[in-house]
Curated annotation (Swiss-Prot), chain B:
Monomer. Interacts with pre-ribosome complex. May bind to RNA. Interacts with NOL8. Interacts with FTSJ3. Residues 1-92 are annotated as: N-terminal domain. The lineage of its organism: Eukaryota, Metazoa, Chordata, Craniata, Vertebrata. It comes from Danio rerio (Zebrafish). Keywords: Nucleus, Ribosome biogenesis, RNA-binding. The gene is nip7. One of its GO terms (molecular function) is RNA binding. This is 60S ribosome subunit biogenesis protein NIP7 homolog. GO terms for cellular component: nucleolus; preribosome, large subunit precursor. SUPFAM superfamilies: Pre-PUA domain (SSF88802), PUA domain-like (SSF88697). Residues 93-180 are annotated as: C-terminal domain. Belongs to the NIP7 family.
Amino acid sequence: MASCSIEDVLAKAERDEAEKLKSITVLKELDLEFDPGLLLAFDKNRLDTRDFKGNKREDCLRSLARDNTQLLINEIWKLPTERVDEVIVAKLPEPTTKLPREKPAPKPKPPTKWEQFAKLKGIQKKKKTNLVWDEVHKEWKRRWGYKRAKDDTKEWLIEVPATADPNEDQFAKRNKAKKERVARNEYNRLKNIARAQKVKVPGTGLLPTSQQTKAELAQAVSLAKISTASVGKFQEKLPKEKPARNTGKKRKFQPLIGDFSSEKQKQLDLLKVMDSKKPRLDITKAVNKQMREEDSESARNNKKGFGKKGRKGGMPGKGKGKGKPGGKGKAPKGKGRKPQMKQGKR
Amino acid sequence: MRPLTDEETKTMFEKLSKYIGENIKLLIDRPDGTYCFRLHNDRVYYMSEKILKLATNVSRDKLVSVGTCFGKFTKTQKFRLHITALDFLAPYAKFKVWVKPGSEQSFLYGNHIMKSGLGRITENTDKYQGVLVYSMADVPLGFGVAARTTQECRKVDPMAIVVFHQADIGEYIRSEDTLT
């Protein structure tokens, strides 16, 4: 009994020992594929589905991971190693597996204005040689930049063109033209960047041009006018000068629910102004009044002769109770009325 | 919806003053509350402050009408009165024309008023003066423009036009779908 138990204990201890220190050799039906550059191993063996689905799943996975890691480490030990600061380091080869990139592929740069134009026109870049032969110095020189061939900045004499002003400084003119070209190029570069980033292009303003058009001149005038410390508030105006067009003034409306009392006051003031604009003496009204008086005068005269009354078509209105007889009934009679009518028709 | 600009206010007041003269003041300055004019879809609406505040809850494209429509601005920025304004203008009318019962119908069909249909007319009416048209029973029927002065009315023949038609309450039926 006792001996049996001792043997058992020894066997168990042996088994435990073997469990703890597993062999570095792992047997697999199919060999693993390795990519030591990425410390990667592919296991193509079938999984034991019965183990995997059962309650021993965790153990199964752990042992699988242990075996495969062991194989990967075996593979790493096959690589050349060296000793760096008491540590053994393996030199990994280049990875063979292609991994997808971490970030999305960069978008192509948006074309500049010139590139758009060149594409439209089918203009293609021509490769030019870097060096050109300089006749003057009898040597090969760069085509552009410092110490270039045919350097027009180094000329000691410039011929005055026949059409140019003889007193003009041709050197200064050339310098100025160059500076403007540089400025313009820089401006275009910034505009290209702004366009590429879909930012609003900053206020274009005015660019130097050889010949300003009428519209450009008008723009220059309006820009110059508001370019004062007071934003053009006290700028004098020419007689009959028209206000600049497209100055960007927007329509502004009062708020929908604002100050009702001030709105009312404004309308009442407007009414007052409209009232005061009316002429004091309304000529047509005055003439009509005169005509009416004459009418009633003659009617009264006629009444003496004819006592007949025709009330139909009478116009009492604001009748003043003058005892005026019906106008319509009398109309055909009065010969004396004709001149009045003419007066009325004036 | 927005308040009228100064220009628009002036145009509208000039048109209204043809009918009610300086009585516009009574429309603006009312003792019974704050009333205002607002523009919406080119139409001028007259409403109280209370109604206006309620109307702000309705989105612009869904709002068909609010308060009383006084008229509309044409594309050339002229103001045209609508018949809906009649109730507000009738009490303040300065010049009136009464139509005989026989030609009431003709006027309500949109025709001008002939001399034969003229019942009464306010004394002193000028030519081209804006007038309000009433039936003989003093029911307001619409607006018009005097084609003749009161004096001339006496002399013209019965078929002559005395008042030009502008708007009448028949429009409530005739142009039911456009009135707001």
